[in-house]
Amino acid sequence: MVIMSTSETKESTPLVCVICDVFNHGAYLRDCLNGLTNQETNFDYTILIHDDASTDSSPHIIKEYEERYPNLFKTIFQKNNQYSQGIGIWKTYQFPRIQTKYVAFCEGDDYWIDSMKLQKEVDFLESHSECSAVFGNIIVRDETVNPITETPSKQLARFFKLEDVLSGTLFPVASICVRRMVIDNWDNSIRSNGDMILAYTAASLGNVYMLNDCMSVYRRTGKGVCTSKDRSQQLIAELKEWYNFHKQLQFPKPLTLIHYQSKVIVRYICNMGLHHFPFKDILKHLRTKYVLIYVYYINKLLIKHIYNIFTTR
């Protein structure tokens, strides 16, 4: 059973909607909703909340903000948890409600720290028709407010293309704003996590631009200390996800598939902490033959390791 509430009273269609998925985010939800409601824009926007049968204070907090901001929220309160039943929240409940030109995202445990975030992103997309999406840099924090990393990279603002996504680049969902066509062209046949499909679809339809501005916080939650073994297992799981994702895409040549799978593996080994994890174990976990991939990229790996040895002395 689904209970829907709406505080939308305006007749005009907002220019932007914000997809906000909530499940037991009560400890962090006020940060999220404060960031969403504090946006300074010269256009109307709406917030589409989906609460997946939270058992904590989340529903109460959402209703509190609905009363404070009666023109912003359209909310679905689930009686039974949908995610645990294998139901896709975005494609089943959120995407069918979208009526706006642009779509932004922010889960209930993430939050925005720039009151001009939506305005900056919409201004950019309005003046760059060749771009399908835009995003800013992010800060990564733990369950409290302690920074894990201030920014994911120090690179300057730049354009990303499909080649980048297929090679292992994902865009921070808490910071991205996409054109409606990204949602309209969503491929429901691809069985993968939403972050990958979002990045792939956006990059397939146009350039994706990264602004230098740091406008969002991604909260990395989890209990206990993450050991190096835990981290390796997590990265292996992510590699499996990429492998399965690549297999579902229609590449014109088999070598093209190998090319992108190789790039993702090398990216993880060199840049994401798997260089201390035995390569044979990586292959075993992936359950596929990557001998050619290993031979093809071994020189690059050696150069990378040698460089790391000398630069860390």
Positions of predicted regions on the chain:
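Catalytic core of nucleotide-sugar-dependent glycosyltransferases
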Residues: 164, 218-222, 227-255, 277-286
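A conserved acidic beta->alpha catalytic loop
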Residues: 51-60, 80, 107
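Conserved donor NDP-sugar-binding/catalytic core segment of glycosyltransferases
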Residues: 116-149
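Glycine-rich, basic loop-to-helix element that forms the pyrophosphate-binding segment
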Residues: 78-99, 120
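Conserved nucleotide-sugar donor-binding catalytic segment
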Residues: 96, 136, 153-232
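Short, well-formed alpha-helical segments that are part of the catalytic scaffolds
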Residues: 25-38
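Short aromatic/hydrophobic "clamp" motif used to bind/position activated sugar donors
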Residues: 103
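Acidic helix N-cap motif at the loop->helix transition within catalytic regions
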Residues: 30, 56-65
